[in-house]
Amino acid sequence: MGYILKILLNIFDYFTLQKVMKKIEFLIGKNFSTLVDVGSHHGEYILSIKKKFNIKEIYGFEPNPIAFEILKKNIINLSGINIYNYGIADTEEDKILNQNIESSSSSINSLNKNSKYYKKKYFLFNFLNLKKVSNSINIKAINLANFIDEKKIDKIDLLKIDTEGYEFKIIKGLEKNISKIKLIHLEHHFDDMIIKNYKFSDIHNYLKNNNFTKIFKIKMKFRKSFEYIYMNKNF
């Protein structure tokens, strides 16, 4: 039963991603120069977007060493993809990655184990007899603004961020280099399972103050999460 549920979620996520990509194609076309993928996991986003778009250079970041090894294998025969076993943060320092029930839900932020959403999720995984992972590991984190400067990247057509509640710090850490980004695709969790210390309105207002406007919004099935696309009005 757990296997069937996972397949169903993957199917729903696939169709959600197709809608997101259709919007991205409408906004910037099928050919563009640079994608930065923060939170690459096993390369699901990179592999999907590589099939649909012609992208000159892709930079992917995945801090979890086990997920990173799978990512390496999944993109081994593809060109133009640069991957790094780092986390992205507002400051360059070692961080603690809290590994959640499934590896794609790991976060630098702490988990609120008293939240109803957390308890429901664990109950479901126990009921389905799915393997649970809940521990912490040390990871290296770098600042994306510094990376952009070091690589001399003049323009990022698409920045995708899926870091389980750490999105706002990554965005703020871009500082002046946020002006080099055309589209930002991010995920936001409205549940209280991850301790974020910010609200979605903080992200929205920060992006708005940096000349970004919200273009797209879609809810992820069976989760209190939404996908958003923001566009830089200066492009």
At which residue positions do the language-model features occur?
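Phosphate/nucleotide-binding beta-alpha loop and adjacent structural elements of enzyme active sites
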Residues: 1-235
